Amino acid sequence: MKIRLENVVKTFDTFRAVRDVSLDIESGELLALLGPSGSGKTTILRMVAGLEYSDGGRIFFGDEDATNIPVRDRGVGFVFQHYALFPHMTLHENIAFGMKVSKVKRDKAAIDARVKELLNLVKLDGLGDRFPAQISGGQRQRVALARALSVDPKVLLLDEPFGALDANVRRDLRRWLREIHDSLGITTIFVTHDQEEALDLADRVVILNQGGIVQQGTPKEVCRQPNSSFVMRFLGDANRVSGVARGGKVYVGENELPFSYTQGDGAVDIYARPGDLEWEDLHEGIPASVERVLDRAGERRVIASTDGGDILEFDVPPENDVTAGDRGSVIIRRAKIFPVA
């Protein structure tokens, strides 16, 4: 099922939550809506579901204008962060509930067979008689997904589905959800503020800020070609160095960096990931002093300050004996350069 949003707008009182958003989601695509709190990602998801109505624009499911279609008639499956399971029902009863109230009537035998099939799909065979309180958080989220799939939705919507779980469980469930999606091929949209989650799971990532789309693309595209300092900072650890562009070249103090810049002269911000920086005892890069060294498994994280006052973080091999107070240079191997706003 292809989904299309055309110039969608949503306002709560005087707050514009979604600003003129247009977006195409291809049939069978796994799409992540990624952004900080207040970026509009959950509001967009709720409008696709029919839980909120837009104040302007249109939403299409395939060729059908679904803008004003009630939620129960849209054919969506919804998974929330906090499971929303019925505590007084067994897992079997929770999964069966949607089928019992659906417009598509099934007899008990058909419902029981479908529940068994779904319990197998989410790897909870034999646990149908248990109650939600008797299983782990990760297992509850699997039940929530099985319940969403029980009504054979055209579209699967997930709102921060792993946010309430610990890091190791989240990683396991991410791999599992990707496998489920690949086997079923249902158009899936999920909301997250977790950059790693979006980049690990999605075919395409839509990055939002202040109610609008700021960039979209494959995980590779948005990571390698961030189009703004916001995207660069939001997607992961980023060091910022103040510089100047002059005559197509970039300088930090008197040090010329090995990058060209064609967007005119003036102040620029130079962004680099920790892995794009190297520490040298020789003074061939940006002069800096080591402020602190954090020892971690397999690496050492160095925090250094440049003579211009910028704070940089980068990693060195565990055998490197750099220590606080050392003087040296930071060499920037790769960077993204943006004009100062």
Swiss-Prot record:
Span of domain ABC transporter: 3-235
Enzyme Commission number(s): 7.3.2.3
Reactions accelerated catalytically: sulfate(out) + ATP + H2O = sulfate(in) + ADP + phosphate + H(+); thiosulfate(out) + ATP + H2O = thiosulfate(in) + ADP + phosphate + H(+)
Superkingdom: Bacteria
Disulfide bonds: none
Molecular functions per Gene Ontology: ABC-type sulfate transporter activity; ABC-type thiosulfate transporter activity; ATP binding; ATP hydrolysis activity
InterPro entries with a match to the protein in the record: AAA+_ATPase, ABC_SmlMolc_Importer, ABC_transporter-like_ATP-bd, ABC_transporter-like_CS, Mo/tungstate-bd_C_term_dom, P-loop_NTPase, Sulph_transpt1
Membrane topology classification: Peripheral membrane protein
The keyword Cell membrane belongs to this UniProt entry's keyword annotation: yes
Keyword terms, alphabetized: ATP-binding, Cell inner membrane, Cell membrane, Membrane, Nucleotide-binding, Sulfate transport, Translocase, Transport
Location in the cell: Cell inner membrane
GO cellular component, as recorded: ATP-binding cassette (ABC) transporter complex
Record: residues binding ATP: 35-42
Self-association and partners: The complex is composed of two ATP-binding proteins (CysA), two transmembrane proteins (CysT and CysW) and a solute-binding protein (CysP).
Protein's job: Part of the ABC transporter complex CysAWTP involved in sulfate/thiosulfate import. Responsible for energy coupling to the transport system.
Family designation: Belongs to the ABC transporter superfamily. Sulfate/tungstate importer (TC 3.A.1.6) family.
Name assigned to this protein: Sulfate/thiosulfate import ATP-binding protein CysA 2
